[in-house]
Amino acid sequence: QDDKAYLESSKILAEALLANEGVKNFAFINRFAPPLICRYQPDMAYGKHADNAFVQVQNTMIRSDISCTIFLEHPEAYEGGELTIHLGDKTVSVKGKAGSAVLYPSTTIHEVMPVTKGERLVAITFIESQIIDEHKRDLLYTLNEVAALEGYNISWDNRVRLQHVSASLHRMWST
């Protein structure tokens, strides 16, 4: 019974992830591991780490380029439990709303702070991007964002040129 509920929940989360334009545009998803639902109760934490380079899914290995945490519980339902991402000498703490997600390079050192009250419920997954290099992926994402923001403010010819550059870079940088 629990396995069936878990599989159904994981399927719903995977479908939501694939339907999210922001996630698709940022991650350039090739494939990803089925979401794993994680429950943290008081005194539970997950120490500093970077995620593994590969994740086994059934009989195949998926390269982990991007890690994704999907928040399943409202932040008011628990205390502590922040996802803390270490970016050089800066630290970013995230405690997202239910249904929100945070994506970050799997090479990033991060941790989950101790839950002090209530229950933290999240799903995690690992995305294999079509573009391995995070800097190239970020450049292409930024280029596409600028093109989308400019929209009809630029001439048709320049839109076509931007689309050509974007598609060419995507093709050149893809695995």
Across the structure, where does each feature detected by a protein language model lie?
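Fe(II)/2-oxoglutarate oxygenase catalytic core
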Residues: Q1-A101, T107, M113-T175
